[in-house]
Amino acid sequence: MGTTKVTTPLIFAISIATIGSFQFGYNTGVINAPEAIIKDFLNYTLEERSETPPSSVLLTSLWSLSVAIFSVGGMIGSFSVGLFVNRFGRRNSMLIVNLLAIAGGCLMGFCKIAESVEMLILGRLIIGLFCGLCTGFVPMYIGEISPTALRGAFGTLNQLGIVIGILVAQIFGLKVILGTEDLWPLLLGFTILPAIIQCAALPFCPESPRFLLINRKEEEKAKEILQRLWGTEDVAQDIQEMKDESMRMSQEKQVTVLELFRAPNYRQPIIISIMLQLSQQLSGINAVFYYSTGIFKDAGVQEPVYATIGAGVVNTIFTVVSVFLVERAGRRTLHLIGLGGMAFCSILMTISLLLKDNYSWMSFICIGAILVFVAFFEIGPGPIPWFIVAELFGQGPRPAAMAVAGCSNWTSNFLVGLLFPSATFYLGAYVFIVFTVFLVIFWVFTFFKVPETRGRTFEEITRAFEGQVQTGTRGEKGPIMEMNSIQPTKDTNA
């Protein structure tokens, strides 16, 4: 158990799975660059249809709907994760939902030719559904096929796929590439290509061995896949751990979303999962990128859009750094460092934004704070919330937990997007103080409540939470900090 061998089949399976993460990142960032061009399309199409120019209110509302409907689709999709993975399996679910990506991409890609605003909005809704499902499927699949000793590092690749997707969308959105009046439908429709690639490659990836053994009782097939993925014949301990979990599952009733909040042994991990997802979206990362172009412009950067892409490069670099740190430092430690660093940078950004009109050099301080803020985000709050949810739950409750956590992430993302412009209007630069307060709250919560899962099997983590519940029923203090000090499973293959 806990092999650290990295095999070609394992890397291939994880790489193909993270195409779904890339799709999420790409479709999150792709709508920003061609904003003015798409508004012109909306204006022209509506004017042709009604023979009168649309009001500015209608135009703004339709643009806002085109952006926000993606998050609405994501909320619905993320909450539907369990319906797919329990019925079709992890790999087959990823394969099936690519039909949504192709359908959404076609609608957006052909909306200009058809002169249809409805096709654009419907395409964004469908692609949101697809991305919402991917945010559940990908971390779950990666977590279940990865060796315990490498689960965190490989789990971080989900976030790497997301940030690469955002970066590619920013680059493709440049006016010299696809961000033009003629080519913007190709920019939106590009999502079809990764979907086709993933459809072609997924049949060569194995199904999750945990799903095969625990859900389907196919022990020999699961054993064969584990041996091929991990490059070792000695998987007896892992198979036994899965069989033990399978036996426990057969004695329990099916775990629903409501059961996650009702059952004492699930309540604490689901609250931790939700809080970690909120710590990602309420950290202010989207606000920083919203402000960045204007700040770079004020600092005298000739092409602020390229500076924003530079911030995206920093985003990507530090996600790679996190891949190598997460199994050394641990999830909890990196999350605390990330939240603390972001809180400091958030205060620094507030001060520099308030003083930059009086002191020109303050703009450069603000740029530095932005880049460091982004770096701290990708060390902790960026990657960790996505994959730690899969670690906190056993096979039975995991799909429902991923659905709840994913839905809370998408919902908070939607609310931040909805409320942030108004907050900025009333608070100005002080809006970052609000995010600082959130960051401090999440830091305190993480310090006292979030356990370290590095090097521990799913069974060990689940039993640790059950131990807290049993201890708590005897009127004693729950050993959440003891859980942080449990030694990882020793590598018997080393």
UniProtKB/Swiss-Prot annotation:
InterPro entries in UniProt: Glc_transpt_3, GLUT, MFS_dom, MFS_sugar_transport-like, MFS_trans_sf, Sugar/inositol_transpt, Sugar_transporter_CS
Keyword Phosphoprotein: yes
Topological domain ranges for the Cytoplasmic compartment: 1-10, 86-90, 143-153, 205-269, 326-331, 390-399, 451-494
Biased composition (Polar residues): 484-494
Location in the cell: Cell membrane; Perikaryon; Cell projection
Residues with Phosphothreonine modification: T232, T492
Residue ranges annotated as Extracellular topological domain: 33-64, 112-118, 175-183, 291-304, 353-363, 421-429
Full protein name: Solute carrier family 2, facilitated glucose transporter member 3
Upper lineage: Eukaryota, Metazoa, Chordata, Craniata, Vertebrata
